[in-house]
Every structure is written in structure tokens, then in C-alpha cells.
Curated annotation (Swiss-Prot):
Protein known as: DNA replication complex GINS protein PSF3
Subcellular location: Nucleus
Disulfide bond sites: none
Keywords from the UniProt entry: DNA replication, Nucleus
Self-association state and partner proteins as the record states: Component of the GINS complex which is a heterotetramer of SLD5, PSF1, PSF2 and PSF3.
Main localisation: nucleus
CDD domains per the UniProt record, alphabetical: GINS_A_psf3, GINS_B_Psf3
Length: 249
């Protein structure tokens, strides 16, 4: 991750719920009340990059620093805002992770779930969440490796498989703004996306039932990966492909 890393910028722009600990003049526009103050205990969502700063900086400590920059820092009072637990880390999601991490649709919960989790863990030094996310990634990485190692792009079927997967990902991206029933909602129509992409690519008529079934199963799983996992799949797939090419020489 770096300053110009697009994924990191998108992660920091993810909105998280906050509660204001003070009444602050002139910020009413944040809740569509221009010219009005934002009231104490008001709850709204702010991008992570802003909420993180406001949750660390305390109003009293800032005033003390302005009056005497050399003064030793004391308790400092409350921070400007209190970060509330996002839906993506709610008990419902955590329980789903513990129950069956492989079937969880991380992309539907948040396309940058794992990157957000790392930032949240670092912010609160949350060891419990860290262990849960570690087990989640370990379980899913093994399955990602299985799918990445079983696909060959050196055959006609492999090329059509890749084409069908890309079509499914594009269809998923186009439907990303559709309503969902909450953070645990899976992407409705994943199976239909797979079938439609397979039909468009000609897989259904050119390969056996077993290969078509494998395509459907693997595509359903890959559509549930968040952006970090998709990059992991791509890197793993390319590594296996290059190794097979080298061995076949």
C-alpha cells in the first residue's frame, strides 16, 4: 500500500458510522442542514480517513496545545467523534465467518473487506478480530489455491473459462448498485450470471457436463472474493500457469 495506491484510497474512502461528542458550528451541511451546527450525539457516516483523525484528536487536548504547545499532554477529554462498529464487523458477520468462512460473500459485504479489517484492527489493537480475520483468510486462501491450480489457460476450454469469468465479473460490477438485504446478503443471481456467461462463451455446447459444473462452482466462489482475494487468485493462477509452461518445455 502506498500514497498513490488506488485500492488504498478506495479503502480509506469507505464510510464508517460515527457519533459526534460535541456540538460543532458550521458542520450542519454534513446532515443536509447548511449553516446549522451539528448537534452532540448526532450519528452519521464519514469516510474512514476523516473519521480516524477525528476519533483520535480530542477537543480539550487541541485547545490546550493551542494555548501552550510545550505543555505536557494530559487526559485530553473526549475525541471529536466516537467510531461505531460498522455493519461489516457486526456480530452477525463475525458469527457467519466462524460458521463457514468459505461460503461467505465478502464482496457483497464490502469489496475491500480484508483491507478494512486490517485498518480497523490496527486502529483499536483488536486481537480478537485479528484472529478471526486470520482464520478467515487462511481458510479461503486454501480454496483460492485449489481453484487457481486447477485451471489451465493453454486449452480452448481454459480460454473460454477465463472469458466467462471476466463476463461474470463485469455483470457483477454493473449490478453493484442494486439493493441488498444487508451486509450478509449474497449477490442475487450469481448462478444466473455464471450460466449466462457460460452460454455466451459457448462452454455449455463445447465441453462436457463435468467441466461446465466445475465452471459454475468455481465462478460462484470467485464472485464472492473481495479485491485482495481476487488479486491473490490472479497472482496464484499466473504462478501455476508459468510453472506449467516451464515444466512443459
Amino acid at each position: 500500500m502506498g500514497y498513490y495506491d488506488i485500492d488504498d484510497i478506495l479503502v480509506d474512502s469507505t464510510e464508517v458510522p460515527c457519533k459526534f461528542n460535541y456540538e460543532i458550528p458550521g458542520l450542519g451541511y454534513l446532515e443536509n442542514n447548511p449553516g446549522k451546527p451539528i448537534r452532540k450525539n448526532t450519528k452519521l457516516s464519514l469516510p474512514l480517513w476523516l473519521a480516524r483523525v477525528l476519533a483520535i484528536v480530542g477537543a480539550d487536548s487541541q485547545e490546550q496545545e493551542d494555548m501552550d504547545p510545550n505543555a505536557e499532554e494530559e487526559d485530553g477529554g473526549d475525541a471529536f467523534v466516537e467510531l461505531l462498529t460498522p455493519d461489516m464487523f457486526s456480530n452477525k458477520v463475525i458469527n457467519a465467518i466462524k460458521t463457514d468462512p468459505k461460503s461467505l460473500d465478502l464482496h457483497a459485504i464490502n469489496p475491500y473487506f480484508l483491507d478494512m479489517a486490517l485498518k480497523w484492527i490496527a486502529l483499536y489493537s483488536d486481537k480478537d478480530l485479528g484472529e478471526i480475520v486470520y482464520e478467515l483468510l487462511l481458510e479461503r486462501a486454501q480454496q483460492i489455491n485449489n481453484y487457481a491450480s486447477s485451471v489451465s489457460i493453454d486449452t480452448e476450454y481454459g480460454n473460454k473459462y477465463r472469458s466467462a469469468l471476466l463476463d461474470a465479473l463485469r455483470l457483477q460490477q454493473n449490478s453493484a448498485n442494486e439493493d441488498r438485504s444487508g451486509p450478509l446478503a449474497s449477490i442475487n443471481g450469481t448462478s444466473s450470471l455464471t450460466t449466462r456467461s457460460a452460454n455466451n462463451s459457448g462452454i455449455g455446447s463445447s465441453v462436457g457436463t463435468s467441466q461446465a459444473t466445475n465452471l459454475a462452482a468455481s465462478t460462484r466462489f470467485l464472485l464472492k472474493l473481495d479485491e485482495f482475494e481476487r488479486q491473490l487468485y490472479k497472482d496464484t493462477h499466473d504462478s501455476y500457469r508459468d510453472t506449467k509452461k516451464w515444466v512443459s518445455k
